[in-house]
Amino acid sequence: MSGFRARGLAFACVALLSFVPATARGEGVIVALGDSLTAGWGVAPDEAYPARLEMRLRREGYTYRVINAGVSGDTTAGGLRRVDWVLHASPEIVIVALGANDGLRGQSPQAMRANLEAIVRRLQAAGARVLLAGMRVPPNYGAEYTTEFQAVFPAVAWSAKVALMPFLLDGVAADPRLNQPDGIHPTAAGHQVIADRLWPYLRPLLGQGK
Protein backbone atom coordinates (compact mmCIF):
# COMPACT_ATOMS: atom_id res chain seq x y z
CA MET A 1 0.00 0.00 0.00
CA SER A 2 3.02 2.30 -0.29
CA GLY A 3 2.70 2.98 -4.03
CA PHE A 4 1.28 6.19 -5.43
CA ARG A 5 1.67 7.94 -2.06
CA ALA A 6 2.21 11.31 -3.70
CA ARG A 7 -0.91 10.90 -5.81
CA GLY A 8 -2.92 9.94 -2.75
CA LEU A 9 -1.63 12.92 -0.80
CA ALA A 10 -2.45 15.25 -3.66
CA PHE A 11 -5.97 13.83 -3.84
CA ALA A 12 -6.50 14.30 -0.11
CA CYS A 13 -5.14 17.86 -0.31
CA VAL A 14 -7.62 18.71 -3.05
CA ALA A 15 -10.45 17.18 -1.04
CA LEU A 16 -9.70 19.31 2.00
CA LEU A 17 -8.61 22.51 0.29
CA SER A 18 -11.80 22.58 -1.75
CA PHE A 19 -13.87 22.19 1.38
CA VAL A 20 -16.56 24.76 2.10
CA PRO A 21 -17.25 25.01 5.86
CA ALA A 22 -20.27 23.08 7.07
CA THR A 23 -21.89 26.20 8.46
CA ALA A 24 -21.88 27.72 4.99
CA ARG A 25 -23.27 24.59 3.35
CA GLY A 26 -25.79 23.71 6.03
CA GLU A 27 -24.39 20.21 6.41
CA GLY A 28 -22.21 18.21 8.76
CA VAL A 29 -18.78 16.88 7.87
CA ILE A 30 -17.39 13.37 8.24
CA VAL A 31 -13.71 12.76 7.48
CA ALA A 32 -12.31 9.33 6.66
CA LEU A 33 -8.67 9.39 7.78
CA GLY A 34 -6.81 6.44 6.34
CA ASP A 35 -4.40 4.92 3.85
CA SER A 36 -4.87 3.48 0.35
CA LEU A 37 -7.77 1.35 1.55
CA THR A 38 -9.60 4.61 2.23
CA ALA A 39 -8.14 6.61 -0.66
CA GLY A 40 -9.55 4.04 -3.05
CA TRP A 41 -6.37 2.86 -4.74
CA GLY A 42 -7.24 1.45 -8.16
CA VAL A 43 -10.87 2.59 -8.22
CA ALA A 44 -12.61 5.83 -9.20
CA PRO A 45 -13.05 8.45 -6.45
CA ASP A 46 -16.82 7.95 -6.40
CA GLU A 47 -16.33 4.19 -5.94
CA ALA A 48 -14.25 4.38 -2.74
CA TYR A 49 -16.08 3.65 0.50
CA PRO A 50 -16.14 7.28 1.75
CA ALA A 51 -18.07 8.32 -1.38
CA ARG A 52 -20.34 5.31 -1.00
CA LEU A 53 -21.03 6.29 2.60
CA GLU A 54 -21.99 9.79 1.50
CA MET A 55 -24.43 8.31 -1.01
CA ARG A 56 -25.94 6.16 1.75
CA LEU A 57 -26.27 9.17 4.03
CA ARG A 58 -28.12 11.08 1.33
CA ARG A 59 -30.47 8.17 0.71
CA GLU A 60 -31.19 7.97 4.44
CA GLY A 61 -31.99 11.69 4.59
CA TYR A 62 -28.80 12.93 6.30
CA THR A 63 -27.00 16.07 5.14
CA TYR A 64 -23.37 15.12 5.67
CA ARG A 65 -20.40 15.55 3.39
CA VAL A 66 -17.82 12.76 3.63
CA ILE A 67 -14.27 13.91 2.93
CA ASN A 68 -11.81 11.27 1.79
CA ALA A 69 -8.55 11.91 3.66
CA GLY A 70 -6.93 8.66 2.62
CA VAL A 71 -3.25 8.75 1.62
CA SER A 72 -1.66 5.72 -0.01
CA GLY A 73 1.13 4.25 2.10
CA ASP A 74 0.17 6.16 5.23
CA THR A 75 0.82 4.80 8.71
CA THR A 76 -0.51 5.76 12.12
CA ALA A 77 2.51 8.06 12.50
CA GLY A 78 1.62 9.79 9.24
CA GLY A 79 -2.00 10.05 10.30
CA LEU A 80 -0.96 11.70 13.54
CA ARG A 81 0.98 14.31 11.58
CA ARG A 82 -2.14 15.05 9.52
CA VAL A 83 -4.61 15.54 12.38
CA ASP A 84 -4.41 19.34 12.46
CA TRP A 85 -4.86 19.41 8.70
CA VAL A 86 -7.97 17.21 9.02
CA LEU A 87 -9.37 19.45 11.73
CA HIS A 88 -9.40 22.40 9.32
CA ALA A 89 -12.53 20.78 7.89
CA SER A 90 -14.28 21.08 11.31
CA PRO A 91 -15.43 17.44 11.20
CA GLU A 92 -18.30 16.27 13.33
CA ILE A 93 -17.19 12.66 12.94
CA VAL A 94 -13.83 11.15 11.96
CA ILE A 95 -13.43 7.57 10.81
CA VAL A 96 -9.88 6.53 11.73
CA ALA A 97 -8.85 3.66 9.46
CA LEU A 98 -5.09 3.40 9.91
CA GLY A 99 -2.66 0.66 10.88
CA ALA A 100 -2.59 -1.63 7.86
CA ASN A 101 0.77 -0.29 6.68
CA ASP A 102 2.17 -0.39 10.22
CA GLY A 103 1.38 -4.08 10.23
CA LEU A 104 2.68 -4.83 6.74
CA ARG A 105 5.96 -3.17 7.72
CA GLY A 106 6.15 -5.10 10.98
CA GLN A 107 6.18 -1.94 13.07
CA SER A 108 5.76 -2.02 16.82
CA PRO A 109 2.18 -2.54 18.03
CA GLN A 110 3.05 -0.42 21.07
CA ALA A 111 4.08 2.50 18.86
CA MET A 112 0.97 2.04 16.74
CA ARG A 113 -1.20 2.15 19.85
CA ALA A 114 0.49 5.33 21.07
CA ASN A 115 -0.09 6.98 17.70
CA LEU A 116 -3.75 5.95 17.55
CA GLU A 117 -4.37 7.13 21.10
CA ALA A 118 -2.79 10.49 20.27
CA ILE A 119 -4.90 10.81 17.11
CA VAL A 120 -8.10 10.04 18.98
CA ARG A 121 -7.29 12.39 21.87
CA ARG A 122 -6.64 15.30 19.53
CA LEU A 123 -9.80 14.66 17.55
CA GLN A 124 -11.87 14.43 20.73
CA ALA A 125 -10.29 17.59 22.12
CA ALA A 126 -11.52 19.39 19.00
CA GLY A 127 -15.05 18.10 19.57
CA ALA A 128 -15.11 15.36 16.93
CA ARG A 129 -16.68 11.97 17.50
CA VAL A 130 -14.50 9.06 16.45
CA LEU A 131 -15.18 5.73 14.79
CA LEU A 132 -12.07 3.55 14.92
CA ALA A 133 -11.73 0.81 12.30
CA GLY A 134 -9.54 -2.14 13.19
CA MET A 135 -7.03 -3.84 10.92
CA ARG A 136 -5.44 -7.28 10.72
CA VAL A 137 -2.19 -8.69 9.41
CA PRO A 138 -1.64 -12.00 7.61
CA PRO A 139 -0.95 -15.01 9.86
CA ASN A 140 2.53 -15.46 8.40
CA TYR A 141 3.66 -12.55 10.58
CA GLY A 142 3.57 -14.98 13.48
CA ALA A 143 1.06 -15.66 16.23
CA GLU A 144 2.64 -13.33 18.78
CA TYR A 145 2.79 -10.34 16.45
CA THR A 146 -0.68 -10.84 14.97
CA THR A 147 -2.21 -11.19 18.44
CA GLU A 148 -0.49 -8.06 19.75
CA PHE A 149 -1.36 -6.13 16.60
CA GLN A 150 -5.06 -6.99 16.61
CA ALA A 151 -5.37 -6.27 20.34
CA VAL A 152 -4.39 -2.64 19.81
CA PHE A 153 -7.67 -1.49 18.27
CA PRO A 154 -10.12 -2.67 20.96
CA ALA A 155 -7.69 -1.42 23.61
CA VAL A 156 -7.62 2.07 22.09
CA ALA A 157 -11.39 2.11 21.62
CA TRP A 158 -11.98 1.02 25.21
CA SER A 159 -9.54 3.50 26.75
CA ALA A 160 -10.85 6.42 24.69
CA LYS A 161 -14.51 5.34 24.84
CA VAL A 162 -14.97 5.51 21.07
CA ALA A 163 -16.92 3.34 18.64
CA LEU A 164 -15.05 0.43 17.08
CA MET A 165 -15.56 -1.48 13.87
CA PRO A 166 -13.40 -4.53 14.63
CA PHE A 167 -12.11 -5.02 11.07
CA LEU A 168 -12.41 -2.54 8.20
CA LEU A 169 -12.20 -5.31 5.58
CA ASP A 170 -14.79 -7.55 7.20
CA GLY A 171 -16.44 -9.54 4.43
CA VAL A 172 -13.89 -8.31 1.88
CA ALA A 173 -10.45 -9.59 2.87
CA ALA A 174 -9.31 -12.76 1.08
CA ASP A 175 -12.32 -12.77 -1.24
CA PRO A 176 -10.93 -12.65 -4.80
CA ARG A 177 -14.28 -11.44 -6.11
CA LEU A 178 -13.97 -8.25 -4.03
CA ASN A 179 -10.26 -7.53 -4.37
CA GLN A 180 -7.97 -6.34 -7.11
CA PRO A 181 -5.28 -8.71 -8.45
CA ASP A 182 -2.84 -7.66 -5.69
CA GLY A 183 -5.15 -9.29 -3.15
CA ILE A 184 -4.91 -6.23 -0.89
CA HIS A 185 -6.93 -3.39 -2.36
CA PRO A 186 -10.71 -3.75 -2.75
CA THR A 187 -12.51 -3.39 -6.04
CA ALA A 188 -15.47 -1.05 -6.39
CA ALA A 189 -17.71 -3.90 -5.24
CA GLY A 190 -15.43 -4.43 -2.25
CA HIS A 191 -15.66 -0.77 -1.31
CA GLN A 192 -19.44 -1.03 -1.39
CA VAL A 193 -19.24 -3.91 1.08
CA ILE A 194 -17.00 -1.82 3.35
CA ALA A 195 -19.50 1.04 3.27
CA ASP A 196 -22.36 -1.33 4.03
CA ARG A 197 -20.48 -2.94 6.93
CA LEU A 198 -19.42 0.45 8.32
CA TRP A 199 -22.95 1.82 8.34
CA PRO A 200 -24.20 0.12 11.55
CA TYR A 201 -21.22 1.55 13.44
CA LEU A 202 -21.54 5.03 11.94
CA ARG A 203 -25.31 5.38 12.26
CA PRO A 204 -25.40 5.81 16.08
CA LEU A 205 -22.90 8.68 15.86
CA LEU A 206 -24.98 10.78 13.48
CA GLY A 207 -26.61 13.89 14.86
CA GLN A 208 -25.21 13.53 18.38
CA GLY A 209 -24.39 16.74 20.19
CA LYS A 210 -20.74 17.56 20.55
Where are these regions (language model features)?
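Alpha-helical cap/lid subdomain in secreted, periplasmic
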Residues: 52-55, 59-62, 78-210
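Bacterial N-terminal signal peptides that target proteins for export
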Residues: 1-12
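Bacterial N-terminal signal peptides
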Residues: 10-20
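Acidic-and-aromatic substrate-binding clefts and catalytic sites of carbohydrate-active enzymes
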Residues: 73-77
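N-terminal twin-arginine translocation
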Residues: 3-5, 19-23
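Serine-esterase "nucleophile elbow" of acetyl-processing enzymes
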Residues: 23-72, 82-90
